UniProtKB/Swiss-Prot annotation:
<dbReference type="GO" id="GO:0097150">
    <property type="term" value="P:neuronal stem cell population maintenance"/>
</dbReference>
<feature type="region of interest" description="Disordered">
    <location>
        <begin position="863"/>
        <end position="884"/>
    </location>
</feature>
<dbReference type="GO" id="GO:0009986">
    <property type="term" value="C:cell surface"/>
</dbReference>
<comment type="subunit">
    <text>Homodimer (via extracellular region). Can also form heterodimers with other cadherins (via extracellular region). Dimerization occurs in trans, i.e. with a cadherin chain from another cell. Interacts with CDCP1. Interacts with PCDH8; this complex may also include TAOK2. The interaction with PCDH8 may lead to internalization through TAOK2/p38 MAPK pathway. Identified in a complex containing FGFR4, NCAM1, CDH2, PLCG1, FRS2, SRC, SHC1, GAP43 and CTTN. May interact with OBSCN (via protein kinase domain 2). Interacts with FBXO45.</text>
</comment>
<feature type="domain" description="Cadherin 1">
    <location>
        <begin position="160"/>
        <end position="267"/>
    </location>
</feature>
<feature type="binding site">
    <location>
        <position position="262"/>
    </location>
    <ligand>
        <name>Ca(2+) 2</name>
    </ligand>
</feature>
<keyword id="KW-0130">Cell adhesion</keyword>
<feature type="glycosylation site" description="N-linked (GlcNAc...) asparagine">
    <location>
        <position position="325"/>
    </location>
</feature>
<dbReference type="GO" id="GO:0016342">
    <property type="term" value="C:catenin complex"/>
</dbReference>
<dbReference type="GO" id="GO:0045296">
    <property type="term" value="F:cadherin binding"/>
</dbReference>
<feature type="binding site">
    <location>
        <position position="260"/>
    </location>
    <ligand>
        <name>Ca(2+) 2</name>
    </ligand>
</feature>
<dbReference type="GO" id="GO:0016477">
    <property type="term" value="P:cell migration"/>
</dbReference>
<keyword id="KW-0812">Transmembrane</keyword>
<feature type="binding site">
    <location>
        <position position="259"/>
    </location>
    <ligand>
        <name>Ca(2+) 2</name>
    </ligand>
</feature>
<feature type="domain" description="Cadherin 4">
    <location>
        <begin position="498"/>
        <end position="603"/>
    </location>
</feature>
<feature type="glycosylation site" description="N-linked (GlcNAc...) asparagine">
    <location>
        <position position="651"/>
    </location>
</feature>
<dbReference type="InterPro" id="IPR000233">
    <property type="entry name" value="Cadherin_Y-type_LIR"/>
</dbReference>
Length: 906
């Protein structure tokens, strides 16, 4: 069993801490200063220091919490400091004066700013033996005694009390390590024991807070505790012999961290927002503010109280609100909230712990912003009692007046938005009032046309309201009602026909000049004397005319119900009525003539072509009648054959099947194949009836056993129409013109070709030495030409000295050529035929000449030409002496030129 001796001494640190907290609370809170809060840290140790033994904790004040600090020791061989500020022994050594004092450095990792603090270690004083014994008896926890039972097993001695927890105040100032209690076993008299503790705070995170001397069993705390981090530590103490064998069962040690008032209350929000309607009664709930305190809520340190420090503005009362000091509920305590006077209140709220003690409590403040919301306590009022406007007649969607109002309520809220209504002066609903969402003005608009001739002025009574009803007890003043006077302006209106359309019934076939009706228009402008004139706007068949003054409509052609311009027996014509107002206006009217049918169309046979066999059997021809008239001037029809020619009734017979159909058959046993025109008399049922002889073209053909014609030809019309004949003639004429133009063009091209040939071949042309070089075709002949053998004379050499070699195909042969007599004169230019014949004769008489009229290749001629330079040519009139004998070497093409310049006097 364990026991605790000297409880009063154990409570001394707690009482000292409470006294210290009271002094701090009374003195206020000092400003935070970064660095070590102490100038010197002290620790009292025993003679021997073991490796890894925690010695003390140096606390660094990090105000903003953002600094990353690393610690160093001035004696790194003996002491080290972890990141939490706990100082450990690096090695085991006996504590002496040389280790009594050293420095601890703290350096900011980012800014490299550095702080230092001194650490002083002192030896535990050597107390007399009696004093040690007394001290050990006072602060000991003894392991429970164990009795040996008869069976050899240990049995714990029963006790009627348990080990009470150790109460340790947070934020103790030390010195550290601070001794708490001594743990010992009754068996230490006979055995050499070693003590240890386990659990969170010892060998489990956070490690190193509690340490125990393994020899003496002295349990100590190495640093200040923080209840807000860990409120209770649960440790287990162990006792083993030097061999590590357990000699006592572990005992539980509970250390409670006593709360100190070291945390100020903190509001959840620094600014709180709330609303309250204007005109609220006292006691109206507004909002709730809340603060929290990290201290123990079951003690005075965590019990908060609220109060209002100030109110701004202080009108109409400096105490418009109050706060529940325990819950933080803010309520109204005075009447007179008016948004139009004060729209917002700002309250400074204070929360204080220790139940609001002004002496020992810590406090904090926040701001409560209370907005006074609007209610509809101000009706809209017109800025004037009367408004005026004007509008042209027959205009709609026109704003005629702008109504302005004032409202003291909050803009653009239902209590401010105006709604206008017309309470009188508009029984037919011709006006409406819309609200401008931006300006809140009322826009009086015309929604139905107004006729000046009916109403010249309107006096409207209008009222203005809000979208929500007025607050209770508030009435609409007279300023919420006004009058609007609207003047209607007369404008020139369109004349109008009445009725429109106008329908009349007339029989077709009326002769031209018949007066049908009078179609006049009315002018709605009764107060504007004006004249109206009429014109025809649409008359598809051009049957009608209208008198421009009186509007009488007369026919100018025969009305025909069967006209394509008549739809469903109705003919539509449109007329225009125009006045002489400023500006002139016009209106249109439609006259619908319902044409009654008369029997003016004779029936016709349908179909107009048919075919039948040479014998009466096996088929017949079914026919019917087409009549453009309608009942009763159409069917039933009567079908008959004429008496003349007599062959009709002799060859054919017709049988009436019903009122619309009849059957045509051969009367004789055989009729030769061919095309026959059979006249048929068809009579309708009109009054009087109308008859017509209609021709049916019948093709009589040979038939097979099924009664089908074996001929493939069909009935073709006996003749062509005039239009077809004209078209065919035009096509023939166009083709003839095209052929004639082609022939003329061919003849002209032949003449041009002959003229070009004359410029090259004739003997009397002085330009025969000009050749055409635009064709440069060629093959292997010009590629194999030996260019080294080309003659390049600067002057024409005699034939005798010309070297023999490869010659050009167009060069005159070396051997002698026949000489032709020189003609005295060139033929007459007009005698083209003789000129050509003479040229042909001269060419044919030269048996040695190659075919010089063939296509030659002139793609390459060496560095010079046998013709020499043309710039050396001079006429005989120049008087220069020239040698033209070389012209004789150019062949028969240039014989005429050689005769002219080198052949004698001519």
């Amino acid at each position: 069993m364990c026991r605790i001796v000297g409880a009063p001494r154990t409570l001394l640190p707690l009482l000292a801490a409470l006294l210290q907290a009271s002094v701090e609370a009374s003195g206020g809170i000092a400003l935070c200063k970064t660095g070590f809060p102490e100038d010197v840290y002290s620790a009292v140790l025993s003679q021997d220091v073991h490796e890894g033994q925690p010695l003390l904790n140096v606390k660094f004040s990090n105000c903003n919490g953002k600094r990353k600090v690393q610690y160093e020791s001035s004696e790194p061989a003996d002491f080290k400091v972890d990141e939490d500020g706990m100082v450990y022994a690096v090695r085991s050594f006996p504590l002496s004066s040389e280790h009594a004092k050293f420095l601890i450095y703290a350096q900011d990792k980012e800014t490299q700013e550095k702080w230092q603090v001194a650490v002083k270690l002192s030896l535990k004083p050597n107390l007399p033996e009696d004093s040690v014994k007394e001290s050990q008896e006072i602060e000991e926890i003894v392991f429970p005694r164990q009795l040996m039972k008869h069976n050899g097993h240990l049995q714990r001695q029963k006790r009627d009390w348990v080990i009470p927890p150790i109460n340790l105040p947070e934020n103790s100032r030390g010195p550290f390590p601070q001794e708490l209690v001594r743990i010992r076993s009754d068996r230490d008299k006979n055995l050499s024991l070693r003590y240890s503790v386990t659990g969170p705070g010892a060998d489990q995170p956070p490690t190193g807070i509690f340490i125990i001397n393994p020899i003496s069993g002295q349990l100590s705390v190495t640093k200040p505790l923080d209840r807000e981090l860990i409120a209770r530590f649960h440790l287990r103490a162990h006792a083993v012999d030097i061999n590590g064998n357990q000699v006592e069962n572990p005992i539980d040690i509970v250390i409670n961290v006593i709360d100190m008032n070291d945390n100020r209350p903190e509001f959840l929000h620094q600014v709180w927002n709330g609303t309250v309607p204007e005109g609220s009664k006292p006691g109206t709930y507004v909002m709730t503010v809340t603060a929290i305190d990290d201290d123990d809520p079951n003690t005075l340190n965590g019990m908060l109280r609220y109060r209002i420090l100030s109110q701004a503005p202080s009108t109409p009362s400096p105490n418009m609100f109050t706060i529940n000091n325990e819950t933080g509920d803010i309520i109204t305590v005075a009447a007179g909230l008016d948004r139009e006077k004060v729209q917002q209140y700002m309250l400074i709220i204070q929360a204080t712990d220790t139940e609001g003690s002004p002496t020992y409590g810590l406090s904090n403040t926040a701001t409560a912003v209370i907005t006074v919301t609007d209610v509809n306590d101000n009706p809209p009022e017109f800025t004037a009692m009367s408004f005026y406007g004007e509008v042209p007649e027959n205009r709609v969607d026109v704003i005629v007046a702008n109504l302005t109002v004032t409202d003291k309520d909050q803009p653009h809220t239902p209590a401010w938005n105006a709604v206008y209504r017309i309470s009188g002066g508009d029984p037919t609903g011709r006006f409406a009032i819309q609200t401008d969402p931006n300006s809140n003005d009322g826009l009086v608009t015309v929604v139905k046309p107004i006729d000046f001739e009916t109403n010249r002025m309107f006096v409207l009574t209008v009222a203005a309201e809000n979208q929500v009803p007025l607050a209770k007890g508030i009435q609409h003043p007279p300023q919420s009602t006004a009058t609007v006077s609207v003047t209607v302006i007369d404008v020139n209106e369109n004349p109008y026909f009445a009725p429109n359309p106008k329908i009349i019934r007339q029989e077709e076939g009326l002769h031209a000049g018949t007066m049908l009706t009078t179609f006049t228009a009315q002018d709605p402008d009764r107060y504007m004397p004006q004249n109206i004139r009429y014109t025809k706007l649409s008359d598809p068949a051009n049957w009608l005319k209208i008198d421009p003054v009186n509007g009488q409509i007369t026919t100018i052609a025969v009305l025909d119900r069967e006209s394509p311009n008549v739809k469903n027996n109705i003919y539509n014509a449109t007329f225009l009525a125009s006045d002489n107002g400023i500006p002139p206006m016009s209106g249109t009217g439609t006259l619908q003539i319902y044409l009654l049918d008369i029997n003016d169309n004779a029936p016709q046979v349908v179909p107009q072509e048919a075919e039948t066999c040479e014998t009466p059997d096996p088929n017949s021809i079914n026919i019917t009648a087409l009549d453009y008239d309608i009942d009763p001037n159409a069917g039933p029809f009567a079908f008959d054959l004429p008496l003349s020619p007599v062959t009709i009734k002799r060859n054919w017979t017709i049988t009436r099947l019903n009122g619309d159909f009849a059957q045509l058959n051969l009367k004789i046993k055989f009729l030769e194949a061919g095309i026959y025109e059979v006249p048929i008399i068809i009579t309708d049922s009109g009054n009087p009836p109308k008859s017509n002889i209609s021709i049916l073209r019948v093709k009589v053909c040979q038939c097979d056993s099924n009664g089908d014609c074996t001929d493939v030809d069909r009935i073709v019309g006996a003749g062509l129409g005039t239009g077809a004949i004209i078209a065919i003639l035009l096509c023939i004429i166009i083709l003839l013109i095209l052929v004639l133009m082609f022939v003329v063009w061919m003849k002209r091209r032949d003449k041009e070709r002959q003229a070009k040939q004359l410029l090259i071949d004739p003997e009397d042309d002085v330009r025969d030495n000009i050749l055409k070089y635009d064709e440069e075709g060629g093959g292997e002949e010009d590629q194999d030409y030996d260019l080294s053998q080309l003659q390049q004379p600067d002057t024409v050499e005699p034939d005798a000295i010309k070297p023999v070699g490869i010659r050009r195909l167009d060069e005159r042969p070396i051997h002698a050529e026949p000489q032709y007599p020189v003609r005295s004169a060139a033929p007459h230019p007009g005698d083209i035929g003789d000129f050509i014949n003479e040229g042909l004769k001269a060419a044919d008489n030269d048996p040695t000449a190659p075919p010089y009229d063939s296509l030659l290749v002139f793609d390459y001629e060496g560095s010079g030409s046998t013709a020499g330079s043309l710039s050396s040519l001079n006429s005989s009139s120049s008087g220069g002496e020239q040698d033209y004998d070389y012209l004789n070497d150019w062949g028969p093409r240039f014989k005429k030129l050689a005769d002219m310049y080198g052949g004698g006097d001519d």
